[in-house]
Amino acid sequence: MFGRVPRSNNTKYYEVLGVPKTASKDELKKAYRKAAIKNHPDKGGDPEKFKELSQAYEVLTDPEKRDIYDQYGEDALKDGMGGGSDFHNPFDIFEQFFGGGAFGGSSSRVRRQRRGEDVAHTLKVSLEDVYNGSMKKLSLSRNILCPKCKGKGTKSEAPATCYGCHGVGMRNIMRQIGLGMIQHMQTVCPECRGSGEIISDRDKCTNCRASKVIQEKKVLEVHIEKGMQHGQKIVFQGEADEAPDTVTGDIVFILQVKVHPRFKRKYDDLFIERTISLTEALCGFQFILTHLDSRQLLIKANPGEIIKPGQHKAINDEGMPHHGRPFMKGRLFVEFNVEFPESGVLSRDQCRALEMILPPKPGHQLSDMDLDQCEETTMHDVNIEEEMRRKQYQRKQEAYDEDEEEDAPRVQCAQQ
């Protein structure tokens, strides 16, 4: 990053610590020690004042940063350090200075931890599983903190802080390349490769070889509750991969309900299709339906209860259980398809007999005069889907032929 840095306030940090601009490193330490204890939030101090003290101490005890601050002020440091985002945590500086028990016990501050990633798995289940409820055991591999070193990666109590980056993992390279010109680059610390820690070969944990984690196989019992939906999530909190200084993420199972050969589900209702004959549609029927829990349901219509093609009948409380209220269920809908007899099955006598039984034909009878004025037609059986495909192909072929005619060379008349 290049830019001309204007001069700004270069006395604020000295005033915050209450020292002159000529203060030595020992004087800075003494001033910080006194002010930090007084203003620590655990002692009722102002958190913003405590933060300012830490920033001032961090800048003025770093010779390179102090030189830039003395020449160009606070704004130059902010521009050169990515908007000031590279300051260390003020509590970290305090604990490095005093240790963890400055007030006779461990600090009440909990170090902010990043959250680990969740791990999602698709779990295929049957419609029977979500109707009856079921349990599945799944074996998974995951990383856990090494039990021998407790995730430190070392034999000793804790790894050493990297001297190259002071535990940050990144190094800021700042150079003055001209009058009022500063070059700033941020790179991964080559000493610790971004970890902020240094572990010697002799101090590496023999169990995890300083990786801090080991692999574990774990069996999870996944309970599919009655009435769960396609796409619903089952969450195992804190069961994903563990890592140091990280809040462990969750393992998430996403239900994928497989298509059933007979039943279809819509919310808490179930649908089935049933094909019946014309005789059954007119004179009644009965059949046995095996439900998702293997119960046998008797489905019937009494003689004279006419079933029309495409008609639906509902059976209460035989649909899906409500999730969370499994004793309440939706409805089971039966859609009826009526299969008519083939042409030629009925004789003329049978047709006349049916006419006597069935309701009369609607409308009036055509007279001989009406018939004489009409042209007689003949109807043929047709597969309408096949007919539409044939028509579509024919239209495409005609359009292709027209394009070829337009692209053909035209014959020019000879000039006289």
From Swiss-Prot:
**Organism expressing this protein natively:** Oryza sativa subsp. japonica (Rice)
**Which GO terms label this protein's molecular function in UniProt?**
ATP binding; Hsp70 protein binding; protein-folding chaperone binding; unfolded protein binding; zinc ion binding
Its predominant location is nucleus
Location(s) in or outside the cell: Nucleus; Cytoplasm
Record keyword Repeat present: yes
What the record says about the induction of its expression is: Induced by a compatible race of the rice blast fungus (Magnaporthe oryzae).
Swiss-Prot/TrEMBL keywords: Cytoplasm, Host-virus interaction, Metal-binding, Nucleus, Plant defense, Repeat, Zinc, Zinc-finger
- What family is this? Belongs to the DnaJ family.
Question: What is the name of the protein in this document?
Answer: Chaperone protein dnaJ A6
Indicate which residues the UniProt annotation says bind Zn(2+) 2: C162, C165, C189, C192
Enumerate composition-biased segments (Basic and acidic residues). 380-399
SMART domains, per this entry? DnaJ
Query: Is Zinc given among the entry's keywords?
Result: yes
